[in-house]
Amino acid sequence: MSMDDFIFGELLGKGSFGSVNIVTRKQDNKQYAMKSVNINNLKEKEKLCSLNEIRILSSLNHPNIIGYHEAFFDTKTRTLNIVMEYAEGGDLHQKIKNNIKAHLHFTEKTIWDWIIQILEGLKYLHDNKIMHRDLKCANIFISKDKILKLGDLNLSIIAKKGMAKTKTGTPYYCSPEIWKDLPYDYKSDIWSVGCILYELCMLKPPFRGTSLKDLGLKVIKGKYSPVIKYYSDDIRKIISKMLVVDPNKRASVDELLNSDILINKISNTRKNIITDEVKIGKKNEKVNLMETIKLPRNLKDINNKLPKKRYRVENEMMENDEYETMKAFFFPEVKNQMNNNDNMNYDYIFNTKKFLKKYIYRGFYLIYK
């Protein structure tokens, strides 16, 4: 795989080390987002961060997390590239900017829809011992089906012991414990979500300062202007559970999703946001994180260490081919009758693909061989 396999479109964003573009994959003519990082410009630690993002993203599968498709090193451009799901709806930061220009506020229903999806994506990460560490409006994307996606896992870590120490994140969304340079846990992400929820209501962050030092002091104090009366007390209560200076008293993602307020909102929201994408998402699935990707001495060898590509269309084609092969192997009479244009369909007896896959993967084909 190389850059030549894609047609480059609009530039979505550019930083000091790389860029994100809309690309069209020639093989399936579908649009994706490609993050390209110039390896030559990165320090050793930054290279490992890029590989860590690939490692984590490729291990995840949830409707509220940006989907991974493939990663490759392009020898011509010397760039490490991650091909991801393209969210046509932009990000929450763009939505806020649009509302500021139009002098509009989001409806409360929209905000509840969004915050529930953010929390469900975050629960999936936390259940798998992953801290995002850079949750902000600009890192939350919206699909064409209006499904929210947590993205940019460059700073995410697997916290096996439940704590982290590295001071990182975006200042407006950093928790008091990070500002104090103290060890922090998953509750630090909750603070960030509280800042996001507040910003969706007020169209500005809860804490702002004339300088970085001033901002830090305000965050540590934890005092913010109340949310306007246009919104309900329920929103104010949920924000107050998140923006608690003491992380031990701050709500966890499970406590929030199981609160009476959100249980009621979730039951109403589900009626509106259920799509095929959500239905197939494995929300409670425990992920098998791939092993740490080690940086080889020769960068040309890095492609051998990267995870396999994952495109839905190709996976479905593989499944269909696999299904036909298994069906012909187990039940040749079905194939013969179908070849003879017999209209009789035996698939219902064996529950189609599920039955066949269940037995072939358990090794029962040896019995019949």
Q: Each PLM stretch: what is its role?
A:
Residues S19:
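Conserved N-lobe ATP-binding subsite of Hanks-type protein kinase domains
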Residues Q31, S36-L60:
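Conserved N-lobe beta3->alphaC-helix segment of eukaryotic protein kinase catalytic domains
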Residues E70-F72:
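A short, aromatic-enriched beta-strand patch in the conserved N-lobe beta-sheet
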Residues T77-D91, K95:
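Conserved short submotifs of the Hanks-type protein kinase catalytic core
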Residues W114-I115:
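Activation segment signature within eukaryotic-like protein kinase domains
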Residues D189:
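Conserved catalytic-loop aspartate of Hanks-type protein kinases
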